[in-house]
Amino acid sequence: MAKAIVDTGVLKSLGLVNKIDLLELIFEDYFFPEAVWHELSSYDNPGFNKRILNSLKSHIFPISTKNHLSLIMDYGESEAVILFGEIKADFLLIDDFKARKIAESLGITCIGSKGIILKAKEKGLVEELSPIFKLWMESNRFFTKKLLNQILVKFEENPI
């Protein structure tokens, strides 16, 4: 199993469908920087009640170097990329397209919310994908219906 750094978008997507626990089931350990914590705790995040937020506190890990990437990506994403390098993580869990492309250009292996859910499905940790995808669509998460339906068809589930 591997270590992962998690960005806000992935935590929001998993929290929305009550699947934060998948992080502990798929990865040896996971962490996120203080900027991600600030984003989660300071803004309205459906799916994140106090209990879920409190359970995540033990995964906060501050960065120790200057955040030189905040000029080219959001603060939480930039701290996540920096933390990835500082603790020599195996994966960066991130959804934002631009930030993901920058991270990949730095040689970082990225997985998004969809990838985590698909890993969980393959391991038998998730029975059905369609209820998860429906919630994401209803909540305006940044996934296209076309792509989600292609995934559902691949796993022999009805499109949404």
Where are these regions (language model features)?
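Generic anion/oxyanion-binding catalytic loop in active/binding sites
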Residues: 12, 118, 137
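Long, charge-dense
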Residues: 113-121, 125
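Long, charged alpha-helical interface segments
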Residues: 122-160
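Active-site-proximal, substrate-binding regions of enzyme catalytic domains
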Residues: 2-89, 97-100, 106-108, 131, ...
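Short beta-strand and adjacent tight-turn residues that come in two discontinuous sequence segments
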Residues: 94
